[in-house]
Amino acid sequence: MNVKKTILAVLVFCSGFFNGYTFEISPEDSLNKNKGDTALTGFQYSRPGTGPFFYKQTLGNLGSAFRSVNFWDERKEFFNSGMNAFKMYEFSENLTPGPSPKERRGKTFSELKFINGSKKEQNFSIKHFQRVTNEISAGLDFGIAHSDGYYSNQVSNLRSFNVYASFQTKNERYNLFANYLSNKIVSQENGGLVSDTAFEITGSFDSKTAAVNFNDVKGLHKSKIFYAQQRFNFFSNRKKPVLTNDSLNISKEITKDSLNAADVSRNRFYLKHVFKYERRSSLFTADRFYSEFFEHAYYDTSKTNDSLFVRNFFNELSLNVENISVLKGKAAFYLAGNHQYFGFYQVDTVNPLSFIDTVMRNFSVRPGGSISWENGLGADIYFEKSFNDLKFDFYKAFGSFHWSVMKNRKKEAEEDEPGEKIFNVEMSLEKEMRNPDFIYSYYNSNHFIWFNQFNPIDFSKAEIKMERFGPVYSKGMFGRNKSFKISGAFYSVKDLTYFNEEALPQQFHERVNVIDANLHHFIKFRKFNLIYDLKYQHADKKEIVRLPVFSSYTSLFYDDNFFKRALYAQFGVDVRYCTWYFADAYMPATGQFYLQDEKEIGNYAYVDVFANFRIKTFRLFLKLEHLNAGFTERVYYTVPHYPMPGRTFKVGINWQFLNDVK
């Protein structure tokens, strides 16, 4: 008992060290003390891509290239560079910056995060939000990380920075949000192991002395983004409208901004302007020509110094009308027009003054709207037409229909409170014709040169989702107790672009069909919790699209309150798995993944054990990743020739401070 009291005293001291701050307990704790805090669920995910929808290809180290194995995983603009392998680590303007609406209630909010792991892996971040006046707010996010890597020549350093501010007039007629983001990733490339056999069968394998393909090869990836959004409301409407479901937030396209969607829904008629400037650069350097790895050295056989730059200007102006009574329902309509100026530049590896550049311009018009009724029925639709320098007929059309069953509101609830959703069905259709990423068309470097004129990609998608929600466990990452979600999608793509077995771009002119099905289940039985995710993917052209047939994530944990409910803790195990498939290989010189037929990977379970702890706003996790490393054959790859790390221990903390001012 004395030991327990000592542990509790230490944790309480840690969580209350700073004077002048009061801590905010989550609503579920204050309303129902015997319920666990779902904010703690998933806290042990220490890296991008290790969450419930985990399965991505990675070279194994923090800061190395990433690729999703979900077919058609990303939503892209009409013009996109294709430099996506490191975006997972970046701060992005598409994410709502700063604290959540709950956290904004206070005058100041701060958050500290720190993760420490084996091989000198350290990850530190800080977040601060300041409400200067009732009309002006500002904030700062900063993150820095370092890792030596589990294998030779894998050192990486990451730095991300985001500063933002918002302004709103007292009558709420005008508001402005702006932020500036800067990301920098320096990652050593080792080209993978020289011999997979030595890794897989050698009894006393030393990861740091194992032979790798590169000695001194690095990739430098930078991005700078300035984003601004302003909105002028023609009428002030301070009374909150009656909302019956989520469809009044217009379409997914419109609500992907940094302003709070609830604030947007209060306005009936407003004009919105979005501006974005983005500059990206990638630098690939090698100390010599690695002839055993690269087939060509077009410019210099002694070294490589390749640069690629992207500049993107984006402006959008939209007129929005919301909460209009139509057909006994509530409707929202908008008309948006945007202009994109896209520049793709490459520097000659020998003569830094020699540029190869491509500039494209695009103008798009997008009308859309949504409608919903009190019986839970709703629909969304939009159409976007592009006019560009390529003279291709680019467009995108989207339509969805959904039905939600809402639990009756309590008598004491506010009149405009929508109630609790317990069942939802959504069906959607999507059709798109767009340009392939620019990297497929133009590239000039020491090891790769190509100039292609590919056809537009013809993309179609049909999807159905069904969700069932059980009683509220707590509002967090995984929703509710006994929640169940199943979805199925059918993709059909003509003129799909990809990188072939020689790491060169190619276009497949036939139609590729893919079936994607997902199952999510969350069950809580007393103190035991089970989270299960299963994905099924099937492509009819397996020679072009390589996907694992099944991939799964399972988390089983026990949670309880200790020390008179002062400490909440979780103890559990995570398991990730996928079936055999010919996973894409990685080309460091271009930062792209390409087809390979030499090595089949998968059929291996990654097992992690963890313990999460929380006192007020102080959280701590202890985690042993890849517990089963070495128990069976060493076949743990997600990318050929790049084995995943072995057994590693990690510890992480998250500390939030809120100065609550009424």
Regions found by a protein language model. Give the residues of each.
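Exposed, low-structure sequence patches enriched in small/polar residues
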Residues: 213, 221-290, 297-662
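Sec-dependent N-terminal signal peptides
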Residues: 6-14
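Positively charged n-region of N-terminal signal peptides that target proteins for export
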Residues: 1-5
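C-terminal segment of classical bacterial N-terminal signal peptides
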Residues: 14-21
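Phosphate/oxyanion-binding loops and surfaces in catalytic or ligand/nucleic-acid-binding neighborhoods
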Residues: 13, 172, 580
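Membrane-proximal, glycine/serine-rich, low-complexity loop/turn segments characteristic
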Residues: 21-224, 232-245, 406-421, 641-648, ...
